[in-house]
């Protein structure tokens, strides 16, 4: 998809390199809720917190995305997630509509009836 649209996807183990010139910065939590073996996890992600210093290397019009819930102060700072560049609330709302549409499709179409016949 990226090559057909003229886009590119880039990953890096260097946080500054990863965001340099980026139009979108997308992160997730470093440690899942209820995860027991967290020793060393924060060390492994050192330098990857999305903060004002890091996003200064991105495109000035960058968008910040996070699948939520965010652990403020861990993977992202308040300044970034609450900034005008953050689209996390729109992202969450769009996810809700997509999930509702999928449920509607499954409940009102042959996909649901086919599943019920398999039981």
Describe every region a protein language model picked out:
Residues 1-119:
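Structural/interface elements that position substrates and couple domains in central-metabolism enzymes
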């Amino acid at each position: 998809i990226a090559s057909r649209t003229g886009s590119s996807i880039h990953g890096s183990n260097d946080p500054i390199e990863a965001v340099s010139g980026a139009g979108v910065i997308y992160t997730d939590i470093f440690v899942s809720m209820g995860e027991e073996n967290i020793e060393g996890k924060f060390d492994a992600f050192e330098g990857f917190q999305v903060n004002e210093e890091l996003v200064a290397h991105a495109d000035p019009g960058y968008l910040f995305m996070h699948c939520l819930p965010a652990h403020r102060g861990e993977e992202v700072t308040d300044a970034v997630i609450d900034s005008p560049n953050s689209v996390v609330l729109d992202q969450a709302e769009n996810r809700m509509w997509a999930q509702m549409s999928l449920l509607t499709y499954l409940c009102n179409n042959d996909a649901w009836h086919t599943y019920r016949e398999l039981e």
